[in-house]
Amino acid sequence: MKALKGLLVLLIITGLLWYVYEEDYHNSGMAGVWGEVKQDAQNIRNSEPVQASITFISNSMAFMTDFLSGSSSEEYEAPSIPSPDLAEPNNQSFSVHNIEITDSIEDVEEVVGELPARVIQNEYETEWHIYHQQYQNFFMVAYDDNDQVFGLYTNQDLLRSNEGISIEATKSEVRAVYGDPIDFIQKGNIRYQVNNDQEYDTFKLDNNYVTFFYDLHQNEQITAVQIISKEMEHRKQGFFGEKSDELVEGLAYQLFDLTNATRAKFELPLLDWHQPAQTTVRQHSLDMAENNYFSHTNLAGLSPFDRLARDDVSYKMAGENIATGQPSSVYAHHGLMNSEGHRQNILNSDFRLMTVGVAVRQDGQPFYTENYITQ
């Protein structure tokens, strides 16, 4: 079987080379072909626009290696973890994992029955308590100073409402129930515009700001919901959070967790945190933030793959996502999921490792860099 696979690969490569260099062979023989190959290799090395092609070749070789060895990501089986029994909310319009805004921390502990998998700083000068079982049944809870819930998030089928809206509803169904989304959030004398574009809608319900995120690649179906109480929202003085080392770390780990929670939804292998590449991505985010640019290629002309090589990070295949302008990792992640190229990295079944680097400008604007790696 391996011999047959090897022969098939050889035939494919031979066919491609013949297609590209047939004319050179007829004109100059093998010497002409070899000279043309060397010249093409030099052109590729010096050509910036072909970096995407180099990436594709790297990914293709990784796939070919798996093909020849008989290994495949199709062998992955998602763990079977039961979903909780969900009921309609009692006091609010929505519940997440049977938890509602204003519930006590004791209520949450009784419902969940376990400690959070991670606790991180968020942009509201409080913390997200992140719960999941191997990234299934994923949700986040934030508490006020009295240990009452005043923030919730989930991207999985844990949402229930009094109006029959669940994670399977579409944008048109949401708007049919709740009307037009709000255009701004007012804090004191300042109005902050809410960018209700195709990707998400924000409504003010029960004195909470409820944001539905939509998947543009799945018929604008709800892909996540975030519920922030008015009190929690007003803790954030501006559009972005207050810059701090704790926030930078929290945003990075949150983006990692959101990515794995999304891969769990699509029954893809979960990613491990790759510490060796963390300096690489953090430095790129810091470079973009300090020098006010946004690009995969830095000001020194180094591509993502050049930077990995510079930092002695080995890989068989690698990819990079970058984002900025969003107020949090939640908005950044869902924006990336609605961008075809970035979505392909997030949902690539062959990646096994991930790291995230975040840098925040003085005005609070975060810059995100994600690296996906298989070694």
Model-inferred region functions:
Residues 16-31:
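Membrane-interface motif at the C-terminal end of an N-terminal transmembrane signal
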Residues 27, 31-32, 36-43, 51-95, ...:
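A cross-family detector of function-defining hotspots
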Residues 35, 106, 110, 172, ...:
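Solvent-exposed, polar/charged alpha-helical surfaces in well-ordered, non-transmembrane soluble domains
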Residues 92-98, 158-165, 240-250, 264-274, ...:
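Second-shell loop/turn segments in exported
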Residues 158-207, 304-375:
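A well-ordered secondary-structure block
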Residues 198-200, 205-273:
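Intrinsically disordered, low-complexity
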